[in-house]
Amino acid sequence: MDTEPEEFAPVVILDEPYWVYNFTRGPPADWDCPFTYQIGRYDEVRPGMYTTPLFGGERDLHVGIDLGGPAGTPVHSFAEGTIHSFGINSEDGSYGPTIVVEYDLSWPPAPLNANPKRKVWALYCHLSTESLDGLAPGQRVQSGGRIATMGKKHENGGWEPHVHFQLSLVEPVVPDLPGVVARADREQALIDYPDPRLVLGALY
């Protein structure tokens, strides 16, 4: 991906080599990743992965980036922003604890903030329940500030520990947006939910 993003803080500090998953052939069976950190890709069709009723049997195109690590791994805000909303998406296979942060960013990101500013929202999902303690809408967050930790499987929607990070140019009504869409909806979804590497950098 040929982008030169302005300076943003890492959402997860990847301080050692990491594994980039390829889920286009479905989730790997009977294989334990030997790396502490893992990446799940954006704009990836993931057949056989989303099997709960929440996904309606047709949504399998991933429109965020997954940053995997041990439960309790700190999650940081990539820029200065404001808590927009938060809550627990409790359906089986959903996000579990979720925080939405609102940002005013030069968009798309460019050197020297060359582009006009606009509001952009970021979802931080599959968090620990305690990550929501003490939060309030309108609360300011600092660039690089710790805002959450990765949740355990029993609290994060039923997934291995990771944070689903997703950008949105559409303001969420509630602390939830589709992180997986139907393939027929891909074109509009990639407009509404742009590539997180615009702020995360070239992770792969």
Regions found by a protein language model. Give the residues of each.
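Histidine-centered active-site/metal-ligand motif
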Residues: 62, 126, 162-164
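Polar/charged, compositionally biased leader and regulatory segments
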Residues: 1-70, 186-204
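Acidic, glycine-rich catalytic/binding loops that coordinate metals and/or anionic ligands
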Residues: 2-7, 107, 113, 133-155, ...
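A residue-level detector for short acidic-glycine micro-motifs
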Residues: 69, 85-87, 126, 152, ...
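Surface-exposed strand-loop junctions at beta-sheet edges and helix termini
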Residues: 69, 78, 129, 135-136, ...
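Terminal peptide-recognition signature
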Residues: 67, 81, 101, 144, ...
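Short, glycine/small-residue-enriched coil/turn segments at secondary-structure junctions
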Residues: 56-91
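Zn2+-dependent peptidoglycan hydrolase active-site motif and core
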Residues: 77-131
